[in-house]
Amino acid sequence: MKTYAEQFASWANSLDVKSLDEDLVKNLKFLLKDICGLVISARNEDYVQSLVKTYKNSGNIFVLGHKEKFDLSSSAIISGTSAHGEDYDDTFEGNPMHVGASMISMCLSAGQYFNLSGEQLIKSLVVGGELMCRLALVAPTAMHKQGFHPTAICGTFGVTAGIASVLNLSDKQFASALGIAGSLSSGIIEYLAEGTSTKRLHPGWATSSGMQAAMIAKNNFAGPRTVFEGDHGFFNSFAKKDIDRNFNELTNDLGKVYHVKNLAFKPFACGTMTQPFIDCAIRLKEKIGDISKIKKIKALVGEGTVHRLWEPISEKRNPSSAYSAKFSTPYCIAIGLLKGKAGLAEFDEKNINDQEILKLTQLIEYEIDPDDEYPKNYSGTLVVETEEGQIIEKQACLRGGKKQPLVFKDIDQKFN
């Protein structure tokens, strides 16, 4: 019987781009626009400039927003890091993960290096993006709870599959490439402790590693066929073992159902699960008017979000860096109430030291809601006690997701 890696390889190699439906291709173009805008907008950020100084003039590949040229690996690292750096990039509903940062960076770098056609780039995006989404569905929340960043560790597989699908690897070589990717995957979430920049690096590193895995396998380097389901495979290594796995998610309805079609696009520059609460807060700003009347705010949350976005509560109420603030739901609620928005400018050193914002974060607490549908649905509820009484505000789904999608003009507004 074929392993899951072999089954996926066989499907990917047989995929005919011309058979893809129009909506899927349109969404991928939407993704391209979003990611390219983010790469360019981050070009002068300190963390991007650190990488440019490290790798500049190492090759002949252009990176959007830079005059220097880079080699294949470093161009991918810079693009992927830039795309994800402000946490303004797409996410996947079903288990939060960022697909575009790695997959579009792969297209930008590998497209130049291998002189890929438009059809090849679309195929690589579909194949790699689909594998990332399906990996996220096998054991939702289990990777985060084990201390790993799904964007990073699944991104390596996605890029490997995307490149393998256009470099004419045989099914055997393709499965080996995925096996190799399992050993090149990395990315822990300890950045949460102090809001350091390693999370930003994850998609770039995944892109570089994934391309290497495919290129090595093309020259017949062997990797384990049982990389996903094996006793020492990806899920037994990177996912918390007390959470059930459904490996059939990797292959069920391949070619019929495309999960990559349902990527969500972010209206705010911060962690995915903070966003429904920001929408609630912005509406409450209009309803309450005088924010000083607020006595207490309680957020009803999904249990799986607490360890990343609510605890330790002292850090979340007083973020130690502007980057840490992006993963603090109390901070995000506070800026929604006070600023009425949550773009790039709201996550800077000035705002994280603003005493009015910090005073408000101290009034914000959470309660785990046993009926919360996370990770199947991303919602938010705020219960606010004011001098006049109680107000409840709900956001039933992620704005920008499949139930309430953004349109092209919404993406344009991000970059105006």
Give a label for each model feature.
Residues 35-42, 99-120, 155-169, 271-289, ...:
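Alpha-helical support elements that line or immediately flank enzyme active sites
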Residues 102-104, 147-166, 176-249:
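Amphipathic alpha-helical interface segments
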Residues 95-101, 122-125, 143-156, 201-205, ...:
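Active-site nucleophile and cofactor-binding loops and adjacent substrate-binding regions
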Residues 82-140:
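Hydrophobic alpha-helical hairpins/lids featuring a short glycine-rich hinge
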Residues 1-96, 198-208, 215-416:
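Terminal-appendage/accessory-domain detector
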Residues 59, 131-139, 184-191, 306-308:
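Secretory-pathway/luminal and periplasmic proteins that interact with or process carbohydrate-rich
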Residues 113-125, 168-175, 223-226:
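Structural helix-adjacent loops and short alpha-helical linkers that scaffold large soluble proteins
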Residues 54, 124-131, 177-184, 300:
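Short acidic/histidine-centered micro-motifs embedded in hydrophobic/aromatic stretches
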